[in-house]
Curated annotation (Swiss-Prot):
Catalyzed reactions per annotation: deamido-NAD(+) + NH4(+) + ATP = AMP + diphosphate + NAD(+) + H(+)
Species name: Pseudomonas putida (strain W619)
GO cellular component annotations of the record: cytoplasm
GO BP annotations listed: NAD biosynthetic process
Amino acids binding deamido-NAD(+): R147, K180, D187, H267, K268
InterPro entries reported for this sequence: NAD/GMP_synthase, NAD_synthase, NH(3)-dep_NAD(+)_synth, Rossmann-like_a/b/a_fold
A Pfam family matched in the record: NAD_synthase
Top-level EC class as recorded in UniProt: ligase
Protein name as annotated: NH(3)-dependent NAD(+) synthetase
Lineage of producing organism: Bacteria, Pseudomonadati, Pseudomonadota, Gammaproteobacteria, Pseudomonadales
Binding site for Mg(2+): D56, E172
Function: Catalyzes the ATP-dependent amidation of deamido-NAD to form NAD. Uses ammonia as a nitrogen source.
Pathway: Cofactor biosynthesis; NAD(+) biosynthesis; NAD(+) from deamido-NAD(+) (ammonia route): step 1/1
Length: 275
C-alpha cells in the first residue's frame, strides 16, 4: 500500500474486506445496531430513505427495515416505521428496477413524489440558466434534481418526526460522486466506510436478486445522457476504486485519477469554509 492510499483509506474510515460470511454478518449486525442507536439518541422512531433502483439505496433500505423490525419487536411499539420514498423525475427509465427493489425491501410505507414540477419551476426562474449551453444547463439541473430529492425526503421526515438516511459509501466518497447538499445530505450514513463490492455483498446476504446486486450503477441525473454509468463519469471502474481503497496495486492511470479526483473534491467532504 502506498502512503497516499493509506492516508485516503484512513480518512474515509474504509473497512477491511470481509474475511468470511461470519464477518459479513457481524458487519451487518453492527450497522443495524448503529441505525438503532441513531434513532434512540435522537428520540425518534421513523426513518426515511429515497429508493432509486440502485444497489446502494437497496442495501441501505434493507439495513434500515431490519433495524425498524428489531426495534418494533424489542419494544412492542408499532410507532417505529421505515418510509421508502420514490422520487422520480417524470418517468424513470429504469422504474422497473426501483419497483423490484421495493418488493425486496418490503418497507412499512412507500411514498412517491414526482420532483419534476419543482425542478422545472426553479429552473424556469433562474436567469443564469437561460444563458448557459445545453450541456451546462443539463448538468446544473441534474444537481437541482438531487437537491430537490433531498428536500422532499426532509419534508417527509419533518412531517413524521424522522431521520433521513444517506447512501454514501467509501467508493463514492473518494470520488466525490455525490451532489453537495443533495444526496450528500443526510442524518445518518449506514454504508459509510464500505467499498462497492461490500455494499453488494450485504445486499446479496439479504437475498436480493443478482439483477439488482450487479446492476450497472448510474446517477441518472442528466437528461442528455440518461443512464450514464458511474464508471464512465469516473474514468475508472469500481473494481479499481475498491482495490485502491483496500491498499491493493492498481494501474498507474487509475491510481492517478483516483488521487486527483479525491483531492479535487475534498470540499465536498468538509464543512463549509469559515474564517
Amino acid at each position: 500500500m502506498q502512503a497516499v492510499q493509506q492516508e485516503i483509506a484512513q480518512a474515509l474510515n474504509v473497512q477491511p474486506p470481509f474475511a468470511d460470511a461470519a464477518a459479513l454478518e457481524a458487519e451487518v449486525a453492527r450497522r443495524v445496531a448503529f441505525i438503532k442507536d441513531c434513532l434512540a439518541n435522537a428520540r425518534l422512531k421513523t426513518l426515511v430513505l429515497g429508493i432509486s433502483g440502485g444497489v446502494d439505496s437497496l442495501t441501505a433500505a434493507l439495513l434500515a427495515q431490519r433495524a425498524i423490525n428489531e426495534l418494533r419487536a424489542e419494544s412492542s411499539d408499532p410507532a417505529y416505521r421505515f418510509i421508502a420514498v420514490r422520487l422520480p423525475y417524470q418517468v424513470q427509465h429504469d422504474e422497473h428496477d426501483a419497483q423490484a427493489c421495493l418488493e425486496v425491501i418490503n418497507a412499512d410505507e412507500v411514498h412517491t413524489v414526482d420532483i419534476a414540477p419543482a425542478v422545472r419551476a426553479l429552473a424556469a426562474e433562474v436567469q443564469a440558466l437561460k444563458d448557459g449551453s445545453p450541456s451546462l444547463v443539463d448538468f446544473v439541473v441534474g444537481n437541482v434534481k438531487a437537491r430537490t430529492r433531498m428536500v422532499a425526503q426532509y419534508t417527509i421526515a419533518g412531517a413524521r418526526a424522522g431521520l433521513v438516511i444517506g447512501t454514501d459509501h467509501a467508493a463514492e466518497a473518494v470520488m466525490g460522486f455525490f451532489t453537495k447538499f443533495g444526496d450528500g445530505a443526510c442524518d445518518l450514513a449506514p454504508l459509510s466506510g464500505l467499498v462497492k463490492n461490500q455494499v453488494r455483498a450485504i445486499a446479496r446476504s439479504f437475498g436480493a436478486p443478482e439483477s439488482l446486486v450487479e446492476k450497472v450503477p448510474t446517477a441518472d441525473l442528466e437528461d442528455l445522457e440518461p443512464g450514464k454509468p458511474d464508471e464512465a463519469s469516473h474514468g475508472v471502474t469500481y473494481q479499481q476504486i475498491d482495490a485502491f481503497l483496500h491498499g491493493l496495486p492498481v494501474e498507474q492511470e487509475a491510481f492517478d485519477i483516483i488521487v486527483a479526483t479525491y483531492r479535487k473534491t475534498q470540499h465536498k467532504r468538509e464543512l463549509p469554509f469559515a474564517p
